[in-house]
């Protein structure tokens, strides 16, 4: 009976204080140069928890000897103390390892929280409407607004006609054309049809330059006529610079007399 109790006691001692944690065996197994650092922790600034566990083991052994005949299933206070001690050691080691692996996260933990949670004010608003609606047509009697009509005239000019629509009226009120267009002389080229340059017979030009008597000239012919003041008296041909010395028209053979433009007369 006494031999069985002694065997159980030695087993409990081995479980509570295994031989791998014995300081004397560690000192004997390690060389003398490494003896001061045998019981140190991984980090030198952190206090080791092994002395606390060793004290708990020494205090738990007499208690186990007195309570040998206790219930086998009920945990003893010594095992609870050792369990809490081992938990503390494991938690401390995991904290130190995480700090060593990720030092930036431990220095500024608030940055990760702020970056993970974005405020609602920074959310993008959708460009398109959630419920898109079709615009009202001009024929709809509920339409109220201004309609602009763009028309390109034969003289390459742009005419914009605004139309004001009032609600409840099917008819629309149109403004008259521009005063310059309305007051155009009936004998001008606009009344006869599309404008045509009297010199080169073109109908397209970026800018019309009329002569002093209202004869339509294109941009190039108008600049030459304004600069040199020379044209054919019969067919209105404005000669080019290379034909200036000749006094005969290349189209009809008439003489090209210099005609003073209004700027040259001044």
Curated annotation (Swiss-Prot):
Major subcellular site: nucleus
Entry superkingdom: Eukaryota
Expressed in which tissues: Specifically expressed in adult testis and ovary. Expressed at high levels in the somatic cells of the developing gonads, including Leydig cells in the testes and granulosa cells in the ovaries.
SMART domains xref list: ZnF_GATA
Keyword field: Activator, Developmental protein, Differentiation, DNA-binding, Metal-binding, Nucleus, Oogenesis, Repressor, Spermatogenesis, Transcription, Transcription regulation, Zinc, Zinc-finger
Assigned GO CC terms: nucleus
Bias type Polar residues, positions: 106-121
Zinc fingers classed as GATA-type: ranges: 197-221
Claim: Lipid biosynthesis is one of the keywords in the record: no
Keyword DNA-binding: yes
Induction: Up-regulated in response to bone morphogenetic proteins (BMPs) signaling.
Subcellular location: Nucleus
UniProt-listed GO biological process terms: negative regulation of transcription by RNA polymerase II; oocyte development; positive regulation of transcription by RNA polymerase II; spermatogenesis
Disordered: region residues: 1-31, 106-129, 171-191
Loss of function: phenotype: Mice are viable and normal; however, both males and females are completely infertile. In females, Zglp1 absence leads to a severe block in germ cell development as early as 17.5 dpc. Ovaries at postnatal day (P) 8 and 6 weeks are highly atrophic with no ovarian follicles. Ovaries as early as 17.5 dpc contain a drastically reduced number of cells expressing Ddx4. In males, Zglp1 absence leads to defective sperm development with a marked reduction in mature spermatids observed as early as postnatal week 1. Male germ cells develop normally until P7.
InterPro entries, sorted: GATA-type_ZnF_Regulator, Znf_GATA, Znf_NHR/GATA
One MF annotation (Gene Ontology) recorded for this entry: zinc ion binding
Function: Transcriptional regulator that plays a key role in germ cell development. Determines the oogenic fate by activating key genes for the oogenic program and meiotic prophase entry. Acts downstream of bone morphogenetic protein (BMP) by regulating expression of genes required for the oogenic programs, which are repressed by Polycomb activities in sexually uncommitted germ cells. Regulates expression of STRA8, a central downstream effector for the meiotic program. Acts independently of retinoic acid (RA).
Protein name: GATA-type zinc finger protein 1
Organism field: Mus musculus
């Amino acid at each position: 009976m006494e031999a069985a109790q002694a065997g159980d006691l030695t087993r409990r001692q081995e479980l509570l204080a295994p031989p791998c944690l014995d300081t004397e065996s560690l000192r004997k197994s390690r060389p003398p140069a490494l003896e001061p650092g045998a019981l140190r922790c991984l980090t030198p600034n952190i206090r080791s928890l092994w002395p606390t566990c060793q004290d708990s083991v020494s205090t738990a052994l007499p208690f186990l000897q007195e309570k040998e005949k206790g219930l086998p299933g009920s945990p003893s206070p010594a095992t609870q103390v050792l369990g809490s001690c081992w938990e503390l050691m494991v938690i401390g080691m995991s904290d130190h390892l995480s700090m060593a692996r990720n030092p930036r996260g431990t220095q500024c933990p608030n940055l990760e929280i702020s970056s993970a949670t974005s405020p609602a004010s920074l959310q993008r608003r959708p460009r398109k409407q959630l419920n898109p609606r079709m615009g009202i047509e001009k024929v709809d009697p509920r339409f109220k607004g201004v309609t602009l009509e763009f028309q390109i005239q034969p003289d390459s000019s742009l005419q914009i006609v605004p139309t004001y629509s009032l609600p409840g009226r099917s008819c629309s009120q149109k403004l008259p054309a521009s005063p310059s267009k309305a007051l155009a002389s009936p004998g001008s080229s606009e009344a006869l049809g599309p404008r045509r340059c009297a010199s080169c017979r073109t109908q397209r030009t970026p800018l019309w330059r009329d002569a002093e008597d209202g004869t339509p000239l294109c941009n190039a012919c108008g600049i030459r006529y304004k600069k040199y003041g020379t044209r054919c008296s019969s067919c209105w041909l404005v000669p080019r610079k290379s034909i200036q010395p000749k006094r005969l028209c290349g189209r009809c053979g008439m003489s090209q007399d210099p005609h003073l433009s209004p700027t040259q007369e001044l």
